[in-house]
Amino acid sequence: KNIITSQSEFHSRLSDLENKIYPHLALNSKIDRSSDLNDKSNSKDQMPISVKDLIGALNFPKDEADSEGFRKLRIALADSENGDLLRASQDVQTLLSQDGIYMDDLIVEPSQPTVWRNFSKGHRGPTVQSLWVIENDETVFLISKKLSDDEIFRDTVNHFLRHFDSSLNELCKKASDSELLRFSDTRTARAFKLLGTASGRFN
């Protein structure tokens, strides 16, 4: 794979890749990156998103017919912090798709609520061990190498991880254990576990 060497090339390649990944994430004609994904103008008029709707948004719609999934996504995108996380999640999943890596194909067990709460409090090592993705060691190795070799990919991943950390702290304050279990199996949480493992974030 060619390494992206500039920000303009990054955005150009994203545009090409989105056409490939959006059918998989169901983020195609119904979500326009230039409008819906970047529109924060009405965020102050929006009611706070429920935990249930946020979790649904973090998983992205199941398919083009998932009107409820698109409803949740639009509500979450209108919120500044959650919208930033969703855009960052979309970006990293788009770049991962370049190497044929899709969150639906990832073999990973949902982590227990206690593990997420411990991580949000700053715990690392054995207490958050179930966040490590060990069943996909070849994928983890590929991503680790790309993090080392590709500056734009690394910056995009770090941007996503920072937003995830911030949103997780708030989610853990509001979510029940059953809600955190559902959250753990979302595409966004799967991406976090994969990228966190590859970057050594859980050590």
Residue ranges and their predicted role:
Residues 1-32:
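Long amphipathic alpha-helical coiled-coil
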Residues 32-42, 54, 58, 196-203:
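Cytosol-facing regions at membranes
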Residues 164, 174-203:
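C-terminal tails and terminal domains of large nucleic-acid-associated
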Residues 13, 25-27, 105, 122, ...:
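Generic signature of intrinsically disordered, low-complexity segments enriched in small/polar residues
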Residues 13, 17-20, 76, 92-95, ...:
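Generic, well-ordered alpha-helical scaffold segments in large soluble proteins
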Residues 39-178, 182:
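Structured extramembrane domains adjacent to transmembrane segments
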Residues 18, 100, 168, 192, ...:
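A structural signal for well-ordered alpha-helices, especially hydrophobic packing surfaces
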